[in-house]
Amino acid sequence: MYGESLVKLMLALDVMDEKKAILIAKETSEYVDSIKIGYPLVLATGLNIIDKIKESTNKEVICDFKVADIPSTNEKIAELTLNHADGIICQGFVGSDSVSAILNVARAKNKKVIVVTEMSHPGATEYLQNVAEDMAKMADRLKVDGIVAPSTRPERLKEIKSIAKDAFVISPGVGAQGGNLSDVLNVLNENDYVIIGRAIYENENPKNAAKKYKIQM
């Protein structure tokens, strides 16, 4: 890892080509603490891409599948995913029984569960924001490992973090979505992660881009 930093850097690797994904992951691994991948890469390449990234970087890989189904289906998705990944992201709005189904699988495998409270895009203010605090309370009650809260709205990030006080935060929105890193760093601590994606992987030099952000943290 590069130096000692207060807040951790999570790379959102939303590319769709296996070779490109592994190359960027390798190039940036000195500066990132964790790698988050989602449906675009996994649907394009298969679940084995998780193992390939882990082997090539020695970093944890979190699957951002935002799982949102009934408990029995959530359990199946978690089982398949966590045979490979170090953690999985699920939606909180489906309720505590669906989240608990994922938690049960994760606990048996010693893996992480991260619950979405409020997303970073503008549309999240239409519906999701209205119940974000309730989902943060649920996350706190269930003792999930982490929560997702937006860098694009630092005041909301602060409020949500204060509710789910024992969970670490992964926070998207810095970079391409316009979130201000300095504002976010005033809220987060050494257990938390700033998520940066396009500003790194779309840069002509992803390694330097990752280094630039890491230095600021």
Curated annotation (Swiss-Prot):
Write out the GO MF terms: orotidine-5'-phosphate decarboxylase activity
Entries under SMART domains matching the protein = OMPdecase (SM00934)
Which EC numbers characterise this protein's activity in its record?
Answer: 4.1.1.23
What's its catalytic activity?
A: orotidine 5'-phosphate + H(+) = UMP + CO2
**What is an example of a Pfam family matching this protein?**
OMPdecase
Q: Which CDD domains match?
A: OMP_decarboxylase_like
| Presence of the UniProt keyword Repressor in the record | no
* InterPro entries in the cross-refs: Aldolase_TIM, OMPdecase, OMPdecase_arc, OMPdecase_AS, OMPdeCOase_dom, RibuloseP-bd_barrel
Task: Cite a single GO BP annotation.
Answer: 'de novo' UMP biosynthetic process
What does the record give as its pathway? Pyrimidine metabolism; UMP biosynthesis via de novo pathway; UMP from orotate: step 2/2
Q: Which GO terms describe its cellular component?
A: cytosol
- At which positions is substrate bound? 14, 36, 64-73, 120, 172-182, 197-198
| The protein's role, per its UniProt record | Catalyzes the decarboxylation of orotidine 5'-monophosphate (OMP) to uridine 5'-monophosphate (UMP).
Membership in a protein family = Belongs to the OMP decarboxylase family. Type 1 subfamily.
Output this protein's name: Orotidine 5'-phosphate decarboxylase
Q: Which organism is it from?
A: Methanococcus maripaludis (strain DSM 14266 / JCM 13030 / NBRC 101832 / S2 / LL)
Query: Corresponding gene?
Result: pyrF
